[in-house]
Regions:
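Catalytic-site neighborhood detector that most strongly recognizes the C-terminal catalytic loop/helix
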Residues: 53-57, 154-171
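Short, basic (Lys/Arg/His-rich) helix/loop patches that form interaction surfaces
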Residues: 8-14, 99-152
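Basic, Lys/Arg- and aromatic-enriched nucleic-acid-binding interface segment
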Residues: 1-33, 37
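C-terminal catalytic core of Y-nucleophile DNA break-rejoin enzymes
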Residues: 56-73, 79-104
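C-terminal secondary-structure termini that scaffold catalytic or DNA-interacting sites
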Residues: 79, 85-90, 110-117, 160, ...
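Feature representing long, continuous alpha-helical segments
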Residues: 4, 26, 34, 38, ...
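Conserved tyrosine-mediated DNA breakage-rejoining catalytic core shared by Y-recombinases
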Residues: 28, 38-74
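Short, contiguous acidic/charged loop-to-helix segments that flank catalytic cores in large enzymes
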Residues: 10-12, 50-60, 85-94, 120-131, ...
């Protein structure tokens, strides 16, 4: 339910990019945001994204579903798959802004008596980029995907790491 709210929320234009990257991470089996932002157009091969994870160097081949393709098409870059890195030297600045705006996204009220000052009420004040990975892992678990498969998808070698991603409150 919360994921649908995030996906369908009529966000301010500047914030939409961060919500889209969040959803794209979820659609691509919880891909790490750093790995996602560093993808190149050549990493799209035959309807799949093929890349090596930065942290582990493990190879991945992830099917690109229509929802993911729509986001990729909206934010397509030249040098990188997504345009956000075309003018940046490091993905961390984007990630920092993404996490800032994810926790703030929600209702915006404009106070005309105070020269149009905006007041933001965050819907999910604890929302961060990594929640896309957590949510993917949790939903996979709810759908009875074996924990070993979830661990492999997330690039985890140890089960205790994967368990920390899965919220058993949803089961």
């Amino acid at each position: 339910k919360d994921l649908r709210i995030i996906r369908d929320f009529p966000a301010e234009e500047f914030c939409q990019r961060y919500l889209d990257v969040f959803m794209l991470s979820f659609y691509l089996i919880g891909i790490n945001i750093g790995d996602l932002l560093l993808l190149r157009p050549t990493d799209m091969v035959g309807g799949r994204i093929e890349f090596s994870r930065q942290k582990t160097k493990k190879r991945y081949s992830i099917k690109v579903e229509p929802e993911a393709q729509e986001i990729i098409n909206r934010w397509r870059g030249k040098k990188y798959l997504l345009c956000f890195m075309d003018e940046r030297a490091d993905y961390r600045s984007f990630l920092k802004m993404m996490n800032k705006h994810l926790k703030e996204f929600g209702r915006v009220e404009v106070d005309k008596a105070r020269w149009g000052k905006k007041t933001k009420t965050g819907l999910y004040p604890f929302l961060r980029s990594y929640y896309a990975r957590d949510t993917w892992a949790t939903l996979a678990s709810v759908l009875d995907v074996p924990e070993d498969t979830i661990a492999a998808a997330l690039g985890h070698g140890k089960k205790n790491v994967t368990k920390s991603y899965i919220s058993f409150n949803m089961k």
